[in-house]
Regions:
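Intrinsically disordered, low-complexity regulatory segments
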Residues: 161-164
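Loop/turn elements at helix/coil->beta-strand transitions in domains of secreted/extracellular proteins
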Residues: 10-17, 72-79, 223-228, 265-271
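Short, acidic/polar
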Residues: 1-8, 201-222
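Active-site cleft segment of glycoside hydrolase catalytic domains centered on the general acid/base Glu
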Residues: 176-205, 233-250
């Protein structure tokens, strides 16, 4: 994997590695492209489903620790790509595994159409990879509340609040928009009760923003991650990014204090954000 390439990267003069988000993504696929002519997987790391666990495709905690430690030995910092604006789409794989959402199919028709493992479905004659949506009852309010829950996201499904039309409340690419602006305690996402591998613990009074910044900064505290590249920065409140920066900075300082033999230097935590469509004019996103 990547760790085995560190010597080569060092020889090239690389001093920082910005890696795709290694956090757990949605499982399975959704229809890809406007025509649905291929299955689209969350290979890019932008459909995070659980901010407390690593995606199995990226390796284990030991693998990550080895990467960070070996990179630091070579003068290379590790940066995570991270997302707090949205989560991923609902997939057949996750609906079945975590018991949320509803289908129009029942009994023998369900088994005949989707089989024992729903994610094995493939489009038939006259169908595309988008056609799996035809089997899903998106209007069943109770069934879809078992997914994230209204306190966590806004989306055009079930009884969720509809997305807005501004940068902060819109549904980017029809993705569920996380309510990072909310001041209401949320509890954990509802489907996490069926997700035994999550490390998420309920914290009294925490909002979605509080959970997200806590979970992300924990990777810094546990592994010594040096920085974040923030995706979709303009779609999340600046106060949320400041909260994350503050917590991650404290976390890295704590990690360096606990691991003086592993730290690269005393440099503080570093963050940069993508504000799509922004020119070189001065603003809160560009100085």
């Amino acid at each position: 994997g990547l760790t085995s390439k560190l010597d080569y990267l060092q020889q090239l003069g690389v001093n920082a590695l910005w890696i795709s988000s290694p956090l757990e993504q949605i499982h399975g696929w959704v229809g890809g492209g406007t025509k649905g002519d291929f299955p689209h997987y969350a290979y890019h790391g932008y459909y995070t489903q659980d901010w407390t666990t690593l995606d199995a495709n990226m390796g284990t905690g030991d693998d990550l620790r080895q990467l960070v430690d070996e990179a630091h030995k070579r003068g290379i910092r590790i940066l995570f790509d991270i997302v707090m604006n949205h989560t991923g789409y609902a997939t057949l794989a996750d609906m079945q595994a975590y018991q949320f959402g509803a289908l129009y199919l029942q009994g023998d028709e369900l088994k005949k159409t989707l089989g024992d493992h729903w994610t094995d479905w493939k489009p038939g004659a006259g169908q595309t990879w988008h056609s799996f949506n035809d089997y899903i009852n998106f209007s069943d309010k109770a069934a879809w509340e078992k997914w994230w829950g209204k306190k966590w996201i806004r989306t055009d499904i079930g009884d969720y609040d509809n997305p807005g039309f501004d940068d902060l409340t819109m549904s980017l690419a029809f993705l569920p928009d996380l309510k990072t602006e909310s001041t209401a305690p949320s509890g954990l996402p509802n489907f996490y009760q069926h997700k035994p591998d999550t490390h998420a613990k309920a914290i009294p009074g925490y909002t979605p923003r509080d959970y997200l910044t806590h979970w992300l900064s924990q990777w810094v505290r546990d592994y010594g991650i040096d920085g974040f590249r923030v995706d979709t920065a303009k779609h999340v409140e600046l106060a949320a990014w400041q909260q994350l920066k503050d917590q991650a900075s404290q976390a890295l300082a704590a990690w360096k204090g606990a691991h003086p033999d592993k730290k690269l230097d005393n440099a503080p935590f570093w963050m940069t954000g993508e504000s799509w469509g922004h020119g070189v004019m001065q603003s809160d996103y560009y100085r």
